[in-house]
């Protein structure tokens, strides 16, 4: 982190970007859950969607506490990605593998977004929340990658 403190508005903007990321993840995992055949994957995706929703809610609370207006929706990129997940799920015969591939792509984007955020000079209380959520995104990413690799090796 640099020593240059961020303005309150910049902190709110950064948190709102992370809220969009969480919402993208929530909706993406739910879309993937709708297309998989495996009950285990459906449960994993639903659980990840719930974690993303909880993360967004936590960040929205911080934004409100800082006097800002919290984002409540996802990004345009996330909406396009969900459309691609839906289309790909309908077109491919191996929807479980396709869903895992798409979820990993989504988690790659979330990981990059959080990696950028933890490098910023956020207030200590905000930085703690962002760092904790970043660790969760890394765990999600690793779990999805592991499931994807396991599925590839059994195919």
Regions found by a protein language model. Give the residues of each.
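A generic hydrophobic-segment detector
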Residues: 112-155
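Short amphipathic alpha-helical/adjacent loop interface patches that line ligand
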Residues: 26, 49, 56, 84, ...
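N-terminal/domain-start segments enriched in small and hydrophobic, helix-friendly residues
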Residues: 2-20, 64, 80-81, 149-153
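Alpha-helical scaffold segments that form or flank carboxylate-/histidine-based iron centers
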Residues: 10-18, 39-57, 96-100, 125-137
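Short, charged, low-complexity loops and linkers
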Residues: 2-12, 34-37, 61-66, 88-95
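Acidic/histidine-rich alpha-helical segments that form the ligand environment
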Residues: 14-34, 81-130
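Charge-rich, acidic-biased intrinsically disordered regions
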Residues: 5, 43, 50, 70-87, ...
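Conserved alpha-helical segments that form or flank metal/cofactor-binding pockets of metalloenzymes
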Residues: 40-78, 144-147
């Amino acid at each position: 982190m640099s020593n240059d403190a961020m303005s309150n508005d910049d902190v709110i903007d950064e948190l709102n970007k992370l809220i969009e990321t969480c919402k993208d993840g929530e909706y993406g995992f739910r879309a993937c859950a709708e297309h998989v055949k495996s009950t285990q994957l459906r449960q994993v995706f639903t659980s990840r969607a719930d974690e993303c929703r909880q993360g967004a809610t936590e960040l929205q609370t911080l934004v409100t506490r800082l006097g800002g207006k919290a984002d409540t929706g996802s990004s345009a990129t996330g909406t396009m990605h969900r459309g691609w997940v839906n289309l790909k799920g309908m077109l491919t015969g191996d929807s479980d593998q396709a869903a895992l591939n798409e979820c990993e792509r989504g988690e790659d984007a979330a990981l990059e977004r959080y990696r950028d955020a933890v490098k910023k000079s956020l207030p200590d209380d905000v930085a703690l929340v962002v760092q904790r959520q970043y660790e969760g995104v890394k765990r999600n990413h690793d779990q999805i990658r592991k499931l994807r690799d396991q599925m590839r090796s059994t195919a």
